[in-house]
UniProtKB/Swiss-Prot annotation:
Entry-linked InterPro entries: DnaJ_C3_Co-chaperones, DnaJ_domain, J_dom_sf, TPR-like_helical_dom_sf, TPR_rpt
Region (Disordered): 522-544
Positions annotated as TPR repeat: 48-81, 82-115, 116-149, 221-254, 257-293, 378-411, 412-445
GO CC term, one of those recorded: endoplasmic reticulum lumen
Taxon lineage: Eukaryota, Fungi, Dikarya, Basidiomycota, Ustilaginomycotina
Comment, domains: The TPR repeats mediate interaction with unfolded polypeptides and the J-domain is essential to stimulate the ATPase activity of the chaperone and to increase its substrate affinity during the folding cycle.
Subunit description: Interacts with the ER chaperone BIP1.
Designated name of the protein: Tetratricopeptide repeat and J domain-containing co-chaperone DNJ1
Length: 581
């Protein structure tokens, strides 16, 4: 009898469990789970409560990631808790994860369609993303639920704020659209030669209106692109690049990534800046999102090849191997384009519309000449300037140095090169000006520049009194043999026995006494006159180290000054007697 009743009792027990929605462990089970092929969804409110407590503690201490993990566990323990979805959504928003937050709001509203706060939060997220239509619809549903609850006339301040912001965004976008049409019309007319320069006030208004929209809706892609365009019209290319960078984060664009790469690498970058690295990173991002993109792959190969040559040149430059620098910059093959030529061609190509594109990579609204403004070319021109100067080939150095100074008037290397040329031309005023400028730019701490400045100052002083080279009619760069030949000729012509004056002969002998001695000539070329008893004693003239800074420098300068030169010198000016024959 008992054995017969047992199966019936088990069947009855199972029926009751199904009816009550209980599992064998006493945990609530959704009854409809048994009606489907899916495994039953078990709910454990006690465990869920524990995870919620952990999540709330994490939220209060700003540990949003820990809070999210706890919310995930809470929802696993109790998937029917719509309030937990709401809390997790707010944590997602704190981390900027708007898409995940919107999904949580959707899950919440399936469980509790009348939870008005979820619609308000949805409206805020949609507005931030610039989706005005969805924001408006969410607000409409929010107002409808509030009306059902009898609270239509007591709208919270938060809801009113969303409404006013939505109105401002819609109005600004409409005005911006009209303004863009006017700018388009003016630009097209300008290309045909029928209009003057674009109205600057309208361009400013474009930037202002777009800025107002983006304060509220930073993810509004179209407005960000419009502002970037107006920034280029204003000549603010780096501000435009910031907007394009944000745009490719919102929606990957191979074209914009190539544009950013060209501008970052070739135009706005400076030596050692992050822009150079960004130039390659933009192309890597393009190939990551679109591995088969031929345009990005081609540009990536080109820049990698350039970087290989540039790395060589930079290494030689830093090790002061200047002939090797020039060799590295000649390019990979003899007779082919140089590295500078390759860079100029890359920039020029970027100003033209390429196959498959609708506009050039460097916008037609770009103000100025991107070749002249290229930061990469500035670096290479500086290398050429320095290398040729160090190799004492000023004729080749100066064209590059002038290009550097045109873009960067305070460039130390180019200023030093110009000073060196001035010294060679015996234009000591210019040399002193340039060396003073370079010394100031170095923070007045570069001893090599300071030494050159002192030499130029001494030469300037000597040129205003005695110029032995001029006396003999020779150049500072002439050889000893040439100087000796000139001396003999002048001595014959000006000897008192031949009708010359004693004074003129004394000047010739004095000049030869210095220039005919290699050691004395070197001293004179450094700005010290061996025949001047006070030679070298310039006190603090142009010397920041003369007082207080480096006392030993002053001591050595004084030692060099007394006596004029080793061995006592010729304090009164030595008289040489020339014998004919």
């Amino acid at each position: 009898m008992k054995a017969t009743l047992l199966p019936s009792l088990l069947a009855l027990s199972l029926t009751l469990c199904l009816a009550l929605g209980l599992s064998s462990s006493g945990v609530l089970v959704r009854a409809d789970a048994f009606a489907s092929s899916q495994p039953p969804v078990v709910s454990d409110p006690v465990l869920a409560s524990q995870h919620l407590t952990q999540a709330n503690v994490a939220l209060q201490s700003g540990r949003y990631q820990d809070a999210l993990s706890a919310f995930d566990l809470a929802l696993q323990a109790d998937p029917s808790s719509w309030l937990t979805y709401y809390r997790r959504a707010t944590a997602q928003l704190s981390l900027g994860r708007t898409s995940a937050a919107l999904q949580d709001f959707q899950s919440l509203l399936k469980l509790n369609p009348k939870f008005d706060k979820a619609y308000l939060q949805q409206a805020k997220v949609y507005l931030k993303e610039g989706d005005c239509d969805k924001a408006k619809q969410a607000l409409k549903t929010y107002d409808s639920i509030r009306a059902e609850k009898g609270a239509a006339n007591s709208s919270p301040a938060e809801a009113n704020s969303v409404r006013s912001k939505l109105t401002l965004v819609e109005t600004s976008i409409k005005s911006l659209g009209q303004l863009v049409k006017e700018l388009d019309k003016a630009q097209k007319a300008d290309k045909k030669g029928k209009a003057k320069e674009l109205d600057s006030t309208k361009v400013d208004h474009c930037i202002h209106l777009a800025g107002e929209v983006l304060k509220i809706s930073p993810s509004h892609l179209e407005t960000r692109l419009v502002r970037a365009r107006c920034q280029t019209m204003k000549g603010r290319i780096e501000d435009a690049m910031a907007d394009w960078t944000r745009a490719v984060h919102l929606t990957p664009s191979p074209f914009l990534l190539r544009r950013l790469s060209v501008l970052s690498y070739f135009v706005v970058s400076e030596p050692g800046s992050q822009s150079r690295d960004a130039g390659l990173q933009h192309l890597k991002a393009c190939l990551h999102s679109d591995p088969d993109n031929k345009s990005c792959a081609k540009m990536h190969r080109k820049i990698k090849a350039l970087e290989k040559s540039l790395k060589k040149a930079r290494n030689f430059y830093n090790s002061q191997s200047y002939r090797a620098v020039l060799s590295a910059l000649k390019g990979g093959k003899v007779g082919r384009a140089t590295v500078v030529d390759d860079i100029k061609e890359a920039i020029r190509s970027a100003t033209e519309v390429q196959s498959g594109d609708e506009e050039p990579l460097i916008p037609s609204t770009y103000k100025g000449d991107p070749v002249q403004e290229s930061g990469l070319l500035l670096e290479l021109h500086t290398m050429y300037c320095k290398a040729y100067t160090e190799l004492n080939d000023m004729d080749k150095a100066m064209p590059y140095c002038e290009l550097v100074l045109a873009k960067d008037p305070d460039n130390v290397e180019a200023t030093l090169a110009r000073a060196e040329l001035a010294l060679q031309r015996e234009d000591y005023d210019q040399a002193v000006r340039d060396l003073t400028k370079a010394f100031d730019a170095s923070g007045r701490t570069d001893r090599a520049i300071h030494q050159k400045l002192q030499t130029a100052q001494k030469r300037l002083k000597l040129s205003q009194s005695k110029d032995y080279y001029k006396v003999l009619g020779v150049k500072r760069t002439d050889s000893l043999a040439t100087i000796k030949k000139a001396y003999r000729k002048m001595a014959r012509e000006n000897h008192p026995d031949k009708g010359g004056s004693q004074e003129k002969m004394a000047q010739i002998n004095e000049a030869w006494g210095v220039l005919g001695d290699e050691e004395l000539r070197k001293k004179y070329d450094q700005g010290d006159d061996p025949n001047d008893p006070m030679g070298g004693q310039q006190g603090g003239y142009g010397n920041p180290f003369a007082q207080g800074g480096h006392p030993f420098d002053m001591f050595f300068q004084q030692q060099a000054g007394f006596g004029g030169f080793p061995g006592g010198g010729f304090p009164g000016g030595q008289q040489f007697h020339f014998k004919m024959g």
